[in-house]
Amino acid sequence: MARKDSEDQKKFMSRMFRGKEIFKPLNTGWIDEHVACVREWVANIFFYTKNGKTIMVDAGYNYERLGEKMGWLDIDPSSIRHILITHQDTDHVGALEQDSELLFRDATIYLSEEENRYLTGEIRRKVIYGLYKLPMVKIDNRRVLLTDGQIIDIDGIKIECILVPGHTWGHMVYLIDDQYLFTGDTIWFGADGGYSFISTLAESNKLSVKSLAVLEENLKRRNESIKIITGHTGWTDNLEFAFRHRAELCAPFKKRMHDPNAPYDGYEESEDTEQSARGARLAKQIDYAAK
């Protein structure tokens, strides 16, 4: 999807979701000493740093302020050599597209074998219950294709690759160093817990719900404290909260529990500043149902 398409999507989505409390991105900053994020309108991209090495999780929109905001975190785009891709939607791979600023032209990207079929043109991405095909994404970066359950090591960082299809056919989540789960667009956090991600954007809602059940059981067996980090609605370390409504869909226009921290318009970025990025840590999602 070209930069113009990204801008058009921004205008359309801003009008459609204004006041609906659907998108609640983190502002640019640090979750803890290992994980940082950049806010791009309603989306977050993430950086994981360990022993002086940094990898990136997703590549956001085709967004002209990415380099600037990475500077707020003291991360040089040229230092990024490895990017984990949860899925190929334009708000997760835009900075890799052919007409982007190509900040990461030399980086290797990692994605599932199934998800790569979108990039080769074997299948097309469909939304709105299969009624609308999205423009094909074009990326030239070197690719490493992953399989479900595969464990890889990048610069001493352990990455477990877990297939969670539904939003897209090859959506993958990444468990890093057994402590941080980057979930992309599989889980949507509401004020009262996690739901299966936005219904109108899924390839198969039925498969999404089934996949989340499998993921929850996978995590429960580990008996470990894990930070669950989403692409659009923040993070939590409460497993029960994250999966509380996993069998239900986030229906964009359905009335739900009010979240006083949700922005009226997620595409308005005036509160995302360098001062805040260099300030306090980014707080986890509040469970308003427990109040």
Predicted feature descriptions by range:
Residues 3-9, 261-291:
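C-terminal regulatory/interaction regions
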Residues 36, 84, 110, 144-146, ...:
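Hydrophobic/aromatic beta-strand patches that form the interior of the parallel beta-sheet core
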Residues 55-58, 79, 83-84, 161-163:
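Short catalytic-loop micro-motif centered on adjacent basic/acidic residues
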Residues 11-19, 23-26, 30-32, 61, 113-165, 169-241, 245, ...:
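Metallo-beta-lactamase
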Residues 63-65, 71-150, 247-256, 260-267:
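Active-site HxH/HxHxD metal-binding segment of metal-dependent hydrolases
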Residues 21-72, 173-184, 188-190:
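Conserved beta-strand hairpin/beta-sheet module of binuclear metal-dependent hydrolase folds
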